[in-house]
């Protein structure tokens, strides 16, 4: 049994439209689940709001990794959770997991986001205040033990 990561999303029940010809959840829905779950954290907890985007800044996904360890089938309950694993001047590294009802690790997601100047369409530094807020969030949601799995993606430390 694995503990969820600090940011927990509401459980999701696998519906018929999420299943494919193999009668299990299609890979598209794993990505969608991860994306929807960490987007809430990104907007609500990390303050990447519509106002921030209107100010000319956002983030773009630079790289993703998904590992599928156990299948989900129709009616199964999925428990998504996330962690802001690392931050530097320009990048964010998130880790997400999907647990099944038995608390077993079913999927691992990692993503690296680059901070973007929407006018130049290029990766740019976070403002000092935003960087400090992100570092503070990461510190207050620190995980004391190592992940029970290897990480595939990495960003440079500050």
Positions of predicted regions on the chain:
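Hydrophobic core residues within well-ordered beta-strands of beta-rich domains
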Residues: 8, 60-62, 78, 92, ...
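Long amphipathic alpha-helical scaffold regions
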Residues: 100, 111-118
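Short hydrophobic alpha-helix segments
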Residues: 109-111, 127
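Generic short beta-strand
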Residues: 16, 96-97, 113
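Hot-dog-fold acyl-thioester-processing enzymes
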Residues: 2-61, 117-158
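Residue-level signal for glycine
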Residues: 103-105
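Hydrophobic beta-sheet segments that form the core/acyl-binding groove
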Residues: 65-101
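Conserved GNAT-family N-acetyltransferase fold
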Residues: 34, 96, 109
């Amino acid at each position: 049994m694995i503990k969820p990561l600090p940011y927990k999303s509401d459980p999701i029940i696998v519906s018929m439209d999420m299943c494919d010809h193999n009668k299990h959840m299609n890979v598209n829905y794993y990505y969608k689940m991860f994306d929807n779950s960490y987007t809430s954290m990104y907007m609500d907890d990390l303050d990447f709001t519509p106002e921030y985007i209107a100010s000319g800044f956002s983030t773009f996904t630079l790289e993703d990794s998904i590992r599928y360890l156990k299948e989900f089938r129709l009616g199964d309950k999925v428990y998504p959770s996330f962690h802001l694993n690392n931050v530097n001047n320009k990048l964010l590294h998130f880790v997400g997991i999907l647990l099944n009802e038995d608390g077993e690790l079913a999927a691992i997601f990692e993503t690296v986001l680059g901070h973007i100047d929407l006018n130049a369409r290029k990766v740019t530094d976070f403002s000092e205040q935003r960087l400090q807020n992100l570092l503070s969030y990461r510190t207050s949601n620190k995980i004391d033990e190592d992940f029970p799995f290897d990480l595939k993606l990495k960003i440079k430390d500050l």
